[in-house]
């Protein structure tokens, strides 16, 4: 689309009014008072989301030949207990004992310190207008706190605050509690003291079936269903690795304090990719296609220094220097960047931030977030994690089901390794019903532990085997642990997983913010400059007036566009044509087709482009062909101007 000049500062109040007026999204159950963290999408919001998902599928699933699945939202307790979510999928919350109000501890510390720094800038006479606009709930809390008025802080305190904010995601509950105590962080509304932070599990618990005996949860992510179907997916892919599965679906998180509109909600749409790869070879065969792409990186080391300086470099160099671990992780980071650019995100407001060690998910060994800046600050929208072999390993162990790849070796290999062999005649009678569990525990030991136990068996004549918290003594006459040679023709391994995970609701929101601007000549005329490929409606059809002669032509034109897959809307209301254009600019409709009296004579129509408001005129077939080409991204409006020439009109 045409480049636009967003001279006016972003006005969130005005933007939110447009979202409400045009019903992009709205709080759920609003006539009953609504529930925080739950939202409904209206017609333009639903269409925008559908187009976003469609572009995502084409960009990832089709382009990368991924295997798409659709798995159950209800997940049994055992699955999420095994995955670690029951014990570790939590945030830190603190409670005001006087009012009962609940705060998410890291967000509270962040908001209060940011507000104090803002007050310090005001006291020093510095301009703080470059700070992201604050949410209404932030403002309400901040304005009641005495410490954050225009009060000058000493330089050391400012430095401490900035250091803390640069690595706010790296603090655990005890550390957050210490920060709250050290810097006297209280309930911003009442100034009341808060309880020590404690963990709150974010999953929605439910009962499966009428008896209530089977506990389950609404899934917190779509990944687990993909892992549990790994063997079927591997078979579907003819046993070949690497390959990727993909899924788009709803996930649920019982957020402590939902806020910021669509950015922190309790029900949301995710799109996740699980790329299964050989742990000994994490090279991606298409990395050369993207290695030249510059990405804006915020590595862990920079954050640990209390800084947020962006390091911009080609992803190929980032991998060579060890900043990004491997080419598969780097490839997906580059592909994520291309996707965000394709849908219309302002790439000058995107960065890839590496997770700190303390904020890393329990399953990840490395993770980079694609964060996008909007009026709420930097928002995590896409995570790109190396989950190693964690998920497949824990599910395999829990179910005693091998979730592995078996690969024929080009040549047989002679290997030496320690093996456990029990004396069947003595072992069974000695341990009775525990015999199988004790034997399996010894066999499952890693090589290093088998070496250690073998030496202990020789030195002491016995070893201790722990099974489910119970210690069993195994004497040397019951078991042998020795190094043996054998020939292998098959290599068996558990693949590692690289996981790009997309919060589509967050992406949708920041896209709408980035697309929004107002006409310089009239700040009340809002425009949403969506790329044509993602716009909810591609074309507006406007008859010049309500003259009955226009109706047949308008209906035929609309039908032609629908047959070509171009969504369109007819606006034959009594409003003047400029007003009709303006309200569809608010919907992000990129093109307008005008039917007038000249159309009735020679079947020519006018094509208007949303951002520039420039128009061209040509025959119906030629204009439709140009429109389709622009919607498909094969040409631009500049190409249409070159072909048809600009048509001057006074209709706006």
Swiss-Prot record:
What is its biological role?
Catalyzes the ATP-dependent ligation of glycine to the 3'-end of its cognate tRNA, via the formation of an aminoacyl-adenylate intermediate (Gly-AMP). Also produces diadenosine tetraphosphate (Ap4A), a universal pleiotropic signaling molecule needed for cell regulation pathways, by direct condensation of 2 ATPs. Thereby, may play a special role in Ap4A homeostasis.
Name-wise, this protein is Putative glycine--tRNA ligase
Keywords of the record: Aminoacyl-tRNA synthetase, ATP-binding, Cytoplasm, Ligase, Nucleotide-binding, Protein biosynthesis, Transferase
Localization of this protein: Cytoplasm
Q: Which taxonomic lineage is given here?
A: Eukaryota, Fungi, Dikarya, Ascomycota, Taphrinomycotina
Q: Kindly list the positions annotated as binding ATP.
A: 253-255, 264-265, 380-381, 506
PROSITE patterns registered for this protein in UniProt: AA_TRNA_LIGASE_II (PS50862)
Instruction: Please tell me where glycine binds in this chain.
Output: 221, 272, 499-501
GO molecular function annotation: ATP binding; ATP:ATP adenylyltransferase activity; glycine-tRNA ligase activity; protein dimerization activity
Q: What is its EC number?
A: 6.1.1.14, 2.7.7.-
Partners and quaternary state? Homodimer.
Could you name the Gene Ontology cellular component terms for this entry? Answer: cytoplasm; cytosol; mitochondrial matrix; mitochondrion
